[in-house]
UniProtKB/Swiss-Prot annotation:
CDD domains per the UniProt record, alphabetical: PurM (cd02196)
Keyword set, alphabetical order: ATP-binding, Cytoplasm, Ligase, Nucleotide-binding, Purine biosynthesis
Pathway linked to the protein: Purine metabolism; IMP biosynthesis via de novo pathway; 5-amino-1-(5-phospho-D-ribosyl)imidazole from N(2)-formyl-N(1)-(5-phospho-D-ribosyl)glycinamide: step 2/2
GO molecular function, one term: phosphoribosylformylglycinamidine cyclo-ligase activity
A single Gene Ontology CC term: cytosol
Gene label: purM
EC number: 6.3.3.1
Class of the enzyme per the UniProt entry, highest EC level: ligase
Catalytic activity: 2-formamido-N(1)-(5-O-phospho-beta-D-ribosyl)acetamidine + ATP = 5-amino-1-(5-phospho-beta-D-ribosyl)imidazole + ADP + phosphate + H(+)
Name this polypeptide is given: Phosphoribosylformylglycinamidine cyclo-ligase
Top-level lineage group: Bacteria
Length: 344
């Protein structure tokens, strides 16, 4: 008679999955909002839309962390990629004026390493807590043979809400409006295939002091900045005409996504100093300037477009909220079919 087999023999450890759930419950609990009904563990999570909304619109977004995860594996650094995961989605839905309500994650691996997965999901919970977003559930998929040992993949899903009359569309943007830029916290979660290629070719000392007490390793792996609370504070007092989360495609490919077809964002390249990380990437990789602008955020993580008469006040308020804000340039009329973001 053949030996009796179990799911664990096939590579799936149900007990490990149960232990992970117990590990993360206290962190998820800290993220809860009044709109969430019930606790973790149900087949579905219940969230009600508060009565403060007259005509609510739900705004959804999903994203991952990309090949930044490869550095997390190589450097055994797993406690901040969860923050990246949350930021990539909540910053996206923020662009349309939405307040993030809840977040779900998908964690997939070949063999579940409970301490490592706990670090990742603690980071997710931290990102949710910092953005006022409830971590209401997720999926942990242990799939033997699907991923190399020690590796995993992440995906995140955020849903927010905004009054229909307050949805930010960018349609009111016009010539003379001011383009503000909020400083990034590094490369965030984009351009890492090129970053990894540059590191591989240049072979730098990753642990030497690099910038303001940080090593190059720390500068490269720094988590994506969350802009939720400062932007929501600005929206309470001012009209923001348009925003762009500077992700894949960099400054020149993301800003046009919110501009009317007859407008151009004219950005002054001297209005902010290229952070040291990007200076190093450009030099070590011999990367052309325009390639930098369409690959990396180059130090600008979120672009905010406002009327000229509001620019000083919005810049001041965001500064009070802890943001470093640059006046990048102006909106002008488009000439022919020129590219809608000009950096010069």
């Amino acid at each position: 008679m053949s030996t009796s087999l179990s799911y664990r023999d096939a590579g799936v450890d149900i007990d490990a999955g149960d232990q992970l759930v117990e590990n993360i419950k206290p962190f998820a609990k800290r993220t809860m909002r009044p709109e969430v009904l019930g606790d973790l563990g149900g087949f579905g999570a219940l969230v009600e839309i508060g009565k403060k909304y007259k005509n609510p619109v739900l705004v959804s977004g999903t994203d991952g962390v990309g090949t930044k995860l490869k550095l997390a594996f190589d450097w055994d650094k797993h406690d901040t990629v969860g923050i990246d995961l949350v930021a990539m989605s909540v910053n996206d839905i923020l662009v349309q004026g939405a307040e993030p309500l809840f977040f779900l994650d998908y964690f997939a691996c070949g063999k579940l390493d409970v301490p490592r997965a706990t670090d990742v999901i603690k980071g997710i919970a931290q990102g949710c807590e910092e953005s006022g977003c409830a971590l209401i559930g997720g999926e942990t998929a242990e799939m033997p043979g699907m991923y190399p040992v020690g590796e995993y993949d992440l995906a995140g899903f955020a849903v927010g809400v905004v009054e229909k009359e307050n949805v930010i569309t960018g349609r009111s943007i016009g010539a003379g409006d001011v383009v503000l830029g909020l400083a990034s916290n590094g490369a965030h979660s984009n351009g890492y295939s090129l970053i990894r290629k540059i590191i591989e070719r240049d072979n730098p000392d990753l642990d030497a002091e690099f910038d303001n007490g940080k090593t190059l390793r720390e500068a490269v792996i720094a988590p994506t900045r969350l802009y939720v609370k400062p932007i929501l504070a600005a929206l309470e007092k001012f009209t923001i005409k348009g925003m762009a989360h500077i992700t894949g495609g960099g400054i020149t490919e993301n800003v046009p996504r919110v501009l009317p077809e007859n407008t151009v964002a004219q950005i002054d390249a001297k209005s902010w100093e290229l952070p040291k990380l990007f200076q190093w990437l450009q030099k070590a990789g011999n990367v052309e300037t325009q390639e930098m602008y369409r690959t990396f955020n180059c130090g600008i993580g979120m672009v905010v477009i406002v009327a000229a008469e509001d620019a000083d006040a919005v810049q001041g308020l965001l500064g009070e909220q802890g943001e470093t804000v640059y006046r990048l340039g102006l909106i002008r009329e488009r000439q022919g079919d020129e590219h809608q973001t000009q950096v010069a």
